[in-house]
Amino acid sequence: MNTRFYNAKILVLDAENHFSITEDELHVTGDTITYIGPGRKADPDAAETPVFDREIDARGNLLIPGFKNAHTHTPMTFLRSYADDLPLHEWLERQVFPNETKLAGDDVYWLNILGIMEYLTSGITSNFDMYIQQKNSIAATVDTGFRTVLTSGLNNFVDSPEILEEMYNYVNELSDRTSYLLGFHAEYTTGGPLLEAVAKLAEKYHSPVWTHNAETKSEVEDCKERWGLTPTQLMERLGMFQYGGGGYHCIWMEDRDFEIFRDRKLTAVTNPSSNLKLASGICPLKHFYDNGINLAIGTDGPASNNCLDMFREMFLTTGLSKVREMDAAGIPADAILYMATAGGAHAMQIDDCDRLAVGKKADLVMIDLHQPNMQPENNLIKNLVYSGSKQNVKLTMVNGQILYENGEFRIGFDPEEIYARSNAIIRRISGSHADN
């Protein structure tokens, strides 16, 4: 599909990673951005005007790169508002792990589609997903037209190094919208032999490694009792970070941990809503930022958030950082927006869709500026971070295809069917229990 956006404000990111806004046209040919500039011709020397399947008057709207949800567990939609108000480890052991064992057949497929629908309404065009039954998850991505990077939730109870390697090869060859990076659930759920196996696979495939890292204070204390090292230091000793990667949450960090992240060029993914809801702590974002460490933002799963909304995550990311450091000027709004877009793309190794530029994949969002919360237009970047909302998302395009527009989904599924299937799954698993 070839699409022309005209009369558009366009958020662009230059080679020095500075945002600016132009008023131009943007052309999409197939899955790629082929022109950004004035006029109508993609090539000013061309004899003929390009042929477009769709021409969209974007007056009063802002085109931005799609948000990258850099940490999530998408199919956990079935546990949204089911088990809440518990600390992390009690929540996992009493509610999450037992109910996950009851997922059967194609449950994960349908639950993943529900999550993808929510992503699209929030302008999220790709996710970095860790969950079980990954062939069902990735099938949902392929069938809806979404973009997903998977990593493994390998632990003492689920999967094996052999399954991890099988999925790594399968997903990386499946589609240009799917990829796989090595990982495991967490140090506290994964024994030494499995950790060593992951390190060997990282060396074999020259792959980054990802995991939950320093999410709670007790996690770090227990790891130090077992190994005499923090989770970050343990993974460094095992050789997991030879080819990059990083950690999700990264709250309870020590000075040496920051040094490892800096020296290995790792990424820290912050998940503010989940960390607040589970009372895990506040990520020391400013320490990462001041050390030049790449940062990204994730929603975490819909059972611990419970919302998949990048606008909310951006506001909480900046707000919590300011309060933690007692510094209202600590991290500027454009840096937060970078984390939610290009920073996430870098973490996920999908740099071909990190920004709106010629030659990049057409993963973009059209933001409605003619809403009270986006006026006046003093600073549109700050509006996105401080006052933006998913109500402003008018259109979401992934890989050149419009998957969501004006409240309607174009993913090949009836939303009512997805809602019905999702409710049926949790009713079956819970025995019709509902926490009212």
Locations of regions flagged by a protein language model:
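A conserved active-site cap/scaffold subdomain adjacent to cofactor or substrate pockets
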Residues: D255-R256, R262-I293, G298-T299
